[in-house]
Amino acid sequence: MQIHLKTLGCRLNEAELETWARQFRQLGHGITTDPDTADLLVINTCAVTEEAVRKSRRLIRRTHNSNPQAKLVVSGCYASLNPGETGDLPGVDLLIDNREKDQLPSLVNTQLADGTMPVIATEPGENPLFSRGRQRAFIKVQDGCRYQCTFC
């Protein structure tokens, strides 16, 4: 898989990109400087100022629009401070919180390796099904399947 890495903000974000590139290579992936040819796009966002937040949102949208077929992973301060807003942006397949940034390449490998579905699609809901009086669960088939349920 070809991966394009992009960052906004501080030197720490830049250092993390270097670490991720090394880890992705160790997992057998290639790193590309061309986002249009990448299979996976990783954006490390910033939220130190309102302008940085705007730039983060703009970069996520622009990156997705330039290569909508690629998976899009977003991490960094903007993603961690505003996960709902970030996850609602078009094309975002996976959010990685700052607490898990050191595991980003392995999380990407496990969470996105088996298809296109976002992580949230197979996480248990806040309320169990029986507490809502339901006998059936809903599966969003348009999001794909990672074959991790008891049915498979």
Task: Report residues per predicted region.
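Proteins enriched for Cys/Gly/acidic motifs involved in redox and nucleic-acid/cofactor modification
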Residues: 1-152
